[in-house]
Every structure is written in C-alpha cells, then in structure tokens.
Swiss-Prot record:
Protein name (database record): Uridine kinase
Top class in the EC scheme: transferase
PANTHER family: URIDINE KINASE
Residue numbers binding ATP: 13-20
Organism: Thermus thermophilus (strain ATCC 27634 / DSM 579 / HB8)
Top-level lineage group: Bacteria
Keywords: ATP-binding, Cytoplasm, Kinase, Nucleotide-binding, Transferase
Pathway(s) this gene product operates in, as recorded in its UniProt entry: Pyrimidine metabolism; CTP biosynthesis via salvage pathway; CTP from cytidine: step 1/3; Pyrimidine metabolism; UMP biosynthesis via salvage pathway; UMP from uridine: step 1/1
Similarity comment: family membership: Belongs to the uridine kinase family.
GO MF, one example: ATP binding
Matching InterPro entries: P-loop_NTPase (IPR027417), PRK/URK (IPR006083), Uridine_kinase (IPR026008), Uridine_kinase-like (IPR000764)
Lineage: Bacteria, Thermotogati, Deinococcota, Deinococci, Thermales
Length: 211
C-alpha cells in the first residue's frame, strides 16, 4: 500500500511580510513531520558573472529564480524522495557550493514571494496562504534586514526597493493574492493564524495516520 500524498501548504507574500517567520513557526510546531522548502534558496546560480553584473540583476522578477529546479524538488518530496536544496549566499549574490538535505515528510511547506505565481506549483498545494503586511512596514523590515544581516548599503537598499522590489511586487506578487485560500495579516506576529494553520495540518495528519 502506497503512502498517502503529503499535505502541501504554500505560503506566499511580499518581501519582509513575515511569510518566512510564519513558515518557520509552523515547521517548529509540527516538528519532524514537516519538509520546508524556501524559494529564496532557488535563485539562479550567477557565479559565472562578475559581481558588478550580479548586483544589477532584478531578484524580484520570476526569471531570477530557478523555478524548474524548485518545481522538480517539490515534486520529488511529494513522491517521497529526499532532495539536496541549494544554499544561496545573499552577501555574494550567488549560490554557495553547499547543499542542505531535505527529507520527505507528511507535510510539505513551499514558501517564498512567488510560490503562488506558477500554476504548476499551485496545482501541488492543498492549502494556499498569502501573508499580507503594510507596504511601509515591509520596506522598513527589509531595510533593517539587508543592512544589518546582508551587509548592504542604505542607499543601495532604497534604490533597489524603488526600482525593482516595489514594481515587481505590484506586478507579480500582489496579484497572486487572488489564489490564496487564506490571507494572513501581520504575518509572523499573528499567533491566531499560526494556530489555525497548525490545527488544519494536524487534522490532515490525523486522517493520514501520521499525527
């Protein structure tokens, strides 16, 4: 008898909306029964380009991501196969030579700004979530994160936000909200939403006999 199909949760939302915080909190709540696949680590490998060219890439456009590899890895997890997730170096703007093993699990969380964008990914999901947050709050969080954690300049972060992040959010990310089954305000600061999502996953696990 084959194992039941994993319960797949897609968590999307704008940059610094709290989607990663929510996904990680949900993964901690469910423990070893979760495989978490963050899309942030699936930026295309641009190590062959000089740093100056890598700095000019629009990392908020769908073309910046290796969506084919992300889909391949998501499908592998659903078939019960482990994957070697790439590791992205945000300071070097390219992939690290390291890989992170991700084991299959009864719950698979797909998380990232564009996980609701490709229909092929949406079709894998049992529950689609969009994390909503005020644009000003998202900008401030991103500013702090990129300057303090990723070593970027204040001027560079502001320019990138105005020229790339904001227009790409309006064009590609925000429209995917219409595909969501659940819209979560306040992202990682919303314990009620976390409890609701965890309860939904636990109920499915119980029906699968994996609780």
């Amino acid at each position: 008898m084959s194992a039941p199909k994993p319960f797949v949760i897609g968590i999307a939302g704008g940059t610094a909306s709290g989607k990663t915080t929510l996904a990680q909190a949900l993964a901690r709540t469910l423990g070893e029964r979760v495989a978490l696949l963050p899309m942030d680590h699936y930026y295309k490998d641009l190590g062959h380009l000089p740093l100056e060219e890598r700095l000019r890439v629009n990392y908020d456009h769908p073309d910046a991501f290796d969506l084919a590899l992300y889909l391949e890895h998501a499908q592998a997890l659903l078939r019960g196969l482990p994957v070697e997730m790439p590791v992205y170096d945000f300071r070097a703007y390219t992939r690290s030579p390291r890989r992170t093993p991700v084991r299959p699990a009864p719950v698979v969380i797909l998380e990232g700004i564009l996980v609701l964008y490709p229909k092929e990914l949406r079709d894998l999901m049992d529950l689609k979530v969009f994390v909503d947050a005020d644009a000003d709050e998202r900008f401030i969080r991103r500013l702090k994160r990129d300057v303090l954690e990723r070593g970027r300049s204040l001027e560079g972060v502001v320019a990138q936000y105005l020229e790339q992040v904001k227009p790409m959010h309006l064009h590609f990310v925000e429209p995917t909200k219409r595909y969501a089954d659940v819209i979560v305000p306040r992202g990682g600061q919303n314990p009620v939403a976390l409890e609701m999502l965890a309860a939904k996953a636990l109920a499915r696990l119980a029906r699968m006999g994996a609780a």
